């Protein structure tokens, strides 16, 4: 299936890759309701590279543990793609505690967010990791 995404002017684009459709959809809706983001929720990590090439995200949120492909595999594919290798990736997982996340826990150099997470906490992480907003 070939998906075309509309231009979104100044809105930042966030790709959410998570096999939990409820989490992915609620994160998408929360980010879009701020008015600052255009988000795409994807439940099949095997389609992450193809979707990212089409969607052209400014940031990718990816679940670490998924049955079809894990988040590390998705990150490796994105980092190997010349057009996507600089896109920030944030892992979302139930494998760490909120305290570990607050202490700056990283996996393969990527920020990690604990699951479950509140919408405003997720928004803060998105804002901190977007190239336009992070001050880097």
Protein language model annotation of sequence segments:
Residues 1-15, 118-136:
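Non-catalytic signal-transmission and effector/linker regions of two-component phosphorelay proteins
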Residues 21-40:
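Two-component/phosphorelay signaling modules centered on CheY-like receiver
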Residues 42-46, 119:
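Conserved Asp/Asn-Gly motif in the active-site loop of CheY-like receiver
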Residues 55-61:
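Active-site beta3 strand of CheY-like receiver
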Residues 63, 93:
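Active-site residues of response regulator receiver
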Residues 66:
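Receiver (REC) domain active-site loop signature in two-component systems and cognate sites
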Residues 115:
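A Lys-centered signature of the CheY-like receiver
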């Amino acid at each position: 299936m070939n998906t075309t995404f509309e231009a979104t002017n100044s809105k930042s684009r966030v790709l959410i890759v998570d096999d939990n459709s409820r989490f992915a959809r609620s994160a998408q809706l929360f980010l879009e309701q701020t008015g600052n983001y255009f988000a795409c929720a994807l439940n099949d990590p095997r389609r992450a590279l193809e979707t990212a090439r089409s969607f052209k995200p400014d940031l990718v949120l990816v679940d670490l543990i998924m049955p079809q492909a894990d988040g590390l595999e998705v990150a490796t594919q994105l980092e190997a793609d010349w057009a996507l290798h600089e896109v920030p990736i944030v892992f979302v997982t139930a494998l760490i505690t909120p305290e570990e996340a607050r202490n700056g826990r990283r996996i393969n150099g990527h920020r990690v967010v604990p699951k479950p997470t509140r919408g405003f906490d997720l928004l803060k992480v998105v804002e901190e990791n977007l190239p336009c907003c992070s001050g880097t």
